[in-house]
Amino acid sequence: MLKWKWVALALVTSALSANAEESSKEKFLNNYGRMLAVEARCPSWKINQQKVVEILNSFKIANADIEPGGHDWPAIERSIHSNQRAFAGIGPKMMCVKANAMYGPKGAVSPGLMEPK
């Protein structure tokens, strides 16, 4: 009986770990879409591609998956559109301030994912 409890515990732990990883992946995809929306409106900041590649590798996401038509593109596209609406009234100068605050070297959301051009 004890053996089955350990098997059940292992299955639950494995499922929770997979859910946490998927949750982190979804957060990254959402942030990536937001960064694309920010980058389109801010002329002085760009996405730090080196950091993005590191994250893609950690989640085992292929570059093609985050391009239009790719496996993960729908989640990114939803984030882009949502953030474009949210940022509609924000000018380029303020958008660059937000880029730094969210994704710059000391960013509150994900530090280092954007850098000055």
Language-model regions: role of each:
Residues 1-2, 41, 69:
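Acidic, low-complexity intrinsically disordered regions
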Residues 2-9:
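Sec-dependent signal peptide recognition
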Residues 9, 24, 85:
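Generic anion/oxyanion-binding catalytic loop in active/binding sites
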Residues 15-17:
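N-terminal signal peptide c-region/cleavage motif recognized by signal peptidases
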Residues 20-47:
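Immediate post-signal-peptide N-terminus of mature secreted/exported proteins
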Residues 45, 50-117:
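Compact alpha-helical subdomains of small soluble proteins
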